[in-house]
Amino acid sequence: MCNTPTYCDLGKAAKDVFNKGYGFGMVKIDLKTKSCSGVEFSTSGHAYTDTGKASGNLETKYKVCNYGLTFTQKWNTDNTLGTEISWENKLAEGLKLTLDTIFVPNTGKKSGKLKASYKRDCFSVGSNVDIDFSGPTIYGWAVLAFEGWLAGYQMSFDTAKSKLSQNNFALGYKAADFQLHTHVNDGTEFGGSIYQKVNEKIETSINLAWTAGSNNTRFGIAAKYMLDCRTSLSAKVNNASLIGLGYTQTLRPGVKLTLSALIDGKNFSAGGHKVGLGFELEA
């Protein structure tokens, strides 16, 4: 099995405690279904309560398992069309090759990326290249794993300017119920997170970040509590006194309701708080 995470997935458990179960300032509906022929359909709609703006997207996915191929098509209300073709675990176990294209009919703009990733038990590597003959940007990352320790590097190189535009490092440790993650971005942004699964019902997370040459330190704590197998409560707070609360209820198999609220602790009586409603249906 290929268990080494990608660079973007380092510290994912802590991020999930902070991000999942919330949807401040919007009404969101997600629908997922699968046809008899194996085509997967998913659609999502958002309506933002402060601006009244609404947006949505539609995605279809079809897998040809015998050949390791996956075809994905995407459309959103900004009239952007996307097509993705991936080929996985056929040329070599853990190797995935992807062609990702985007087309905007209104402007005629076209863009694309070639992606490759290779994952094994002790390492994972990957690279993306923009399809741009004027000077593509090359993205790359690598993660090494040894007895629970993880070390990662991420970079991007602008060939048009012959300049390294991104230079990130990460170091962490992962156990069954505990994760530690630290990172440095471009030598100026520093951050870290701690994830702890206290027991089967309680998950906690701490997040800390700061920027060199600035006094702006960001700090937050979050927790998730499972009331039962169908109901969970989430809460988080940061050093800006923003308090987030979330309630998730599985009404029946495949039907989930999420209620959330963001409270400004510094200006509690002034208003400006945000609420959110989410509805997920899978059939």
Curated annotation (Swiss-Prot):
Q: What is its main location?
A: mitochondrion
Transferase listed as a keyword: no
Keywords, A to Z, come to: Acetylation, Ion transport, Isopeptide bond, Membrane, Mitochondrion, Mitochondrion outer membrane, NAD, Nucleotide-binding, Phosphoprotein, Porin, Transmembrane, Transmembrane beta strand, Transport, Ubl conjugation
Which reaction does this chain catalyze?
chloride(in) = chloride(out); K(+)(in) = K(+)(out)
Q: Which GO terms describe its cellular component?
A: extracellular exosome; membrane; mitochondrial outer membrane; mitochondrion; nucleus; pore complex; synapse
Domain of life assignment: Eukaryota
As one GO molecular function, the record gives: voltage-gated monoatomic ion channel activity
- Binding-site residues for NAD(+), renumbered to this chain: L242, I243, G244, S260, A261, L262, I263, D264
One BP annotation, GO: neuron-neuron synaptic transmission
What does the protein in this record do? Non-selective voltage-gated ion channel that mediates the transport of anions and cations through the mitochondrion outer membrane and plasma membrane. Forms a high-conducting channel with a stable open state and a voltage-induced closure with a mild preference for anions over cations. Involved in male fertility and sperm mitochondrial sheath formation.
Task: Tell me what this protein is called.
Answer: Non-selective voltage-gated ion channel VDAC3
Task: Provide the tissue specificity.
Answer: Expressed in erythrocytes (at protein level). Widely expressed. Highest in testis.
Q: Which family does this protein fall into?
A: Belongs to the eukaryotic mitochondrial porin family.
Chain segments annotated as coiled-coil in the UniProt record: none
Q: Where are the transmembrane segments?
A: 26-35, 39-47, 54-64, 69-76, 80-89, 95-104, 111-120, 123-130, 137-145, 150-158, 163-175, 178-185, 189-198, 202-211, 218-227, 231-238, 242-251, 254-263, 273-282
Entry annotated with the keyword Endoplasmic reticulum:
no
Glycyl lysine isopeptide (Lys-Gly) (interchain with G-Cter in ubiquitin) cross-link, renumbered residues: K53, K61, K109, K110, K163, K266, K274
Sites of Phosphoserine modification:
S241
Post-translational modification Phosphothreonine, affected residues: T4
Chain positions found as N6-acetyllysine: K12, K15, K20, K90, K266
Post-translational modification here is noted as: Ubiquitinated by PRKN during mitophagy, leading to its degradation and enhancement of mitophagy. Deubiquitinated by USP30.
Subunit record text: Interacts with ARMC12 in a TBC1D21-dependent manner. Interacts with MISFA.
